[in-house]
Curated annotation (Swiss-Prot):
Cofactor note: Binds 2 [4Fe-4S] clusters. One cluster is coordinated with 3 cysteines and an exchangeable S-adenosyl-L-methionine.
Binding partners and assembly: Monomer.
Protein name, per record: tRNA-2-methylthio-N(6)-dimethylallyladenosine synthase
Positions bound to [4Fe-4S] cluster 1: C19, C55, C89
Cofactor annotation: [4Fe-4S] cluster
Keywords in alphabetical order: 4Fe-4S, Cytoplasm, Iron, Iron-sulfur, Metal-binding, S-adenosyl-L-methionine, Transferase, tRNA processing
CDD domains, alphabetized: Radical_SAM
Family: Belongs to the methylthiotransferase family. MiaB subfamily.
GO MF annotations, alphabetized: 4 iron, 4 sulfur cluster binding; metal ion binding; N6-isopentenyladenosine methylthiotransferase activity
Species classification: Bacteria, Bacillati, Bacillota, Clostridia, Eubacteriales
Subcellular location: Cytoplasm
Domain Radical SAM core: residue ranges: 151-382
One Pfam family from the record: Radical_SAM
Length: 447
């Protein structure tokens, strides 16, 4: 395989599975390739490089990767110079890279979560030497700054502030595949945000597996609340969001920063996972139902108009009907504006995988459907309250469902679709909400 053969068509295609951190990793892979003269395509048929950036939080994500990898066999047959690369969390699992190469020997490059910055080097080796490259680092290295990044949006951007997780929830594989917590220096974060603002970006979402742990291990004396206040001082920036927060670490200082900093949006993603104190203990979440509800009350009392969103796992080992009803009642009490609901998925090498009393699939699905129905009913009622109100929306671009409309979000994260000129993209506009829908709002520009 030669460089010349592969350069006839310098197109690449990236498929991203999983969370926002994976999305930002893919933006970096795209940035590295574009800096080498490649262009992105969504059509695998015309790509000379295909990358799968994988997730392993749930079995379903892994099955999708295996299915899509199988479909690439014919493409590789048609074009032997096609380079197929697999990376991300799924590859970081013990034995997974070898399993992939055994089942799909036509894969050219495999790497994990700690060495994505080396992708150009791996690609060069494949193109120049015709070798197969597999490199999974078992230990996280230092944070690599300054990688080129190809952002999906021109209006809003993800900025990672820390990597890894130290919490070891019993159901979760993230600490095993993303490593221990490491924080970026605040000066590097501020520099990245200032560069984004200079390019016209208006909104930043700060990312981390647990943003509330930010600052641990750094030489400088700073915590997450301190970082939020620093980011709030960046001139020209309009809005700041963050995710994900662990309830046990969401401090009063962070709540007050959201309240007092004008650029911080009134939206908190606060994963509860279960409304049962017994199950929360089994999950190793380090808080109980009462602690969580007290935290919610504190947030609501300090931050008017705050919206709360969450993650919930249904069917954790040993979950009884009573435990499930505790979750339902907690959702009713909190009144979430949206919730990411998941059926528990067994993950190898996690404590929950070895637990007895795994819940049968039919019970899991029944509880899941009941939960989704209850949450959606509440969301519809909450969205109805916006009808007739005037809200400030940052215009993000054309609506996904109707390209004749524009779309954007309120400060507290509500999605609003409306008719307007494309010149408004990137602008803050006032919209009157004329109709509420289950998952979005319809607005009209206020002249």
């Amino acid at each position: 395989m030669t460089l010349e053969n592969n350069m006839d068509k310098k197109l690449f295609c990236i498929s991203t599975y999983g969370c926002q951190m994976n999305e930002e990793d893919s933006e970096k892979l795209s940035g590295m390739l574009k800096s080498q003269g490649y262009e992105r395509t969504e059509n695998k048929e015309e790509a000379s490089i295909i990358i799968f950036n994988t997730c392993c939080v749930r079995e379903n994500a892994e099955n999708k990767v295996f299915g899509n990898l199988g479909q690439l066999k014919q493409l590789k047959k048609k074009n032997p110079n096609l380079v197929i690369a697999i990376c991300g969390c799924m590859m970081q699992q013990v034995g997974m890279a070898d399993k992939v190469l055994k089942t799909f020997p036509y894969v050219d490059i495999i790497f994990g979560t700690h060495n994505a910055h080396k992708f150009p080097e791996y690609l060069h080796r494949v193109l120049q030497e015709g070798v197969q490259v597999k490199e999974i680092l078992n230990k996280e290295e230092g944070i690599v700054e300054g990688l080129p990044i190809d952002r999906k949006s021109d209006v809003k951007a993800f900025v990672t502030i820390m990597y890894g997780c130290n919490n070891f929830c019993t159901y979760c594989i993230v600490p095993y595949v993303r490593g221990r917590e490491r924080s970026r220096k605040s000066e590097d974060i501020i520099k990245e945000i200032e560069e984004l603002v200079s390019k016209g970006y208006k909104e930043i979402t700060l990312l981390g597996q647990n943003v509330n742990s930010y600052g641990k291990g750094l030489e400088e004396d700073i915590d997450f609340a301190g970082l939020l206040r620093k980011v709030n001082e960046v001139k020209g920036l309009e809005r700041v969001r963050f995710m994900t927060s662990h309830p046990k670490d969401l401090s009063d200082d962070v709540i007050m920063a959201i309240k007092e900093c004008d650029k911080l949006c009134e939206q908190v993603h606060l994963p509860v996972q279960s409304g049962s104190s017994r199950i929360l203990k089994e999950m190793n979440r380090h808080y109980d139902r009462e602690y969580y509800l007290d935290l919610v009350k504190k947030i609501k009392s300090e931050i008017p108009d705050v919206t709360l969103t969450t993650d919930i796992i249904i069917g954790f080992p040993g979950e009884t009907e009573e435990d499930f009803l505790d979750t339902l009642s907690l959702c009713e009490e909190v009144g979430y504006d949206s919730a990411f609901t998941f059926i528990y998925s067994r993950r190898n090498h996690t404590p929950a995988d070895k637990m007895e009393n795994q819940i049968p699939d039919d019970i899991k699905h029944d509880r899941f459907n009941r939960l989704v129905e209850a949450i959606n009913k509440k969301v519809v009622i909450k969205n109805k309250e916006y009808e007739g109100k005037v809200v400030e929306v940052l215009v993000e671009g054309p609506s996904k469902n109707d390209e004749t409309k524009l779309t954007g979000r309120t400060r507290n994260g509500k999605l609003v679709n409306f008719a307007g000129d494309e010149k408004l993209v990137g602008e803050l506009v006032n919209l009157k909400i004329v109709r509420a829908q289950p998952f979005s709002l319809i607005g009209e520009i206020v002249e």
